């Protein structure tokens, strides 16, 4: 829901790509720092309390991001927004692993599919509101209202407990947990590129108006959602390793299409391929973490989430730096090469 705001923030504050990338780094730092804490808090107070508190903080940040013109306040708000998002992501995955294991069924892709559905509704909805001439601030107030209504409906069904606290709040990942974390790192980096730079790419390099730039992330989120909603059946049919291999190849091809064919239609097609390719890699990785015995679950889930989200921490800033000294196209192609590495890694992972 925040992706369509990026071009407005860039334009309102007169930021170049390098500065924007550094500011987006604040969001990643907030996420990274909150995740180990979220795992410990979920173990102590339960998933429900932490998910409710983190979502409320997100709702407080969104209207500020739509209006801020002060650089220090923008930095602080991005940090808090990132920390809140990190709390939601980590705790939701803790709950998902618990539920999947208790059910004895393959469910992780479906859970992540609903997360992606929120990306579609948020990005496309905000883009639609902005295209009607509604101000960014008013659009965010509408989003906040709808989010709080949904939270009130969902909260009673969230788990009042988390994973048992069998270890420290954070431990350096090792063995298969580290390997899974590195795969997640690359995929999250690619997702961060779509979230933070897809709109800028469309407006700066493909001549798309700012009010429609959010469609880039909406297309990415749409194919990711479809892939995940059907992902549990796909994983059962072809196996976890093939899902990672084929997904990495598809996502790499998508970034190449978006970058090398200089029309906005090709960019949207490329974003669609990236979403489809990345859709089930991370869910498969989280399921694998729930089955591994190298590290306690209460430590392993926050650990791979933290390593994975380091991709979002490093990715936007690195892409902004490369775009500043060279080009955004080169930055996207580097990410494509990294996704080829994910495909290779998928053949080595024991799931």
What are these regions (language model features)?
Residues 4-18, 196-212:
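Short amphipathic helix-loop junctions that connect adjacent transmembrane helices
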Residues 14, 46, 67-72, 207, ...:
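Helix-breaking motifs and short loop linkers at transmembrane-helix boundaries and internal kinks
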Residues 28-29, 116-121, 221-222, 226, ...:
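Short hydrophobic/small-residue motifs within alpha-helical transmembrane segments
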Residues 34-46, 130, 227-239, 323:
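Helix-to-loop junctions at the C-terminal end of transmembrane segments
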Residues 48-51, 244:
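Primarily marks hydrophobic transmembrane alpha-helices of the MFS/SLC 12-helix fold
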Residues 56-69, 250-262:
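C-terminal ends and interior cores of transmembrane alpha-helices
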Residues 78-113:
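Cytoplasmic helix-loop-helix junction between adjacent transmembrane helices
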Residues 110-159:
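Helix-loop-helix hairpin linking two adjacent transmembrane segments in secondary transporters
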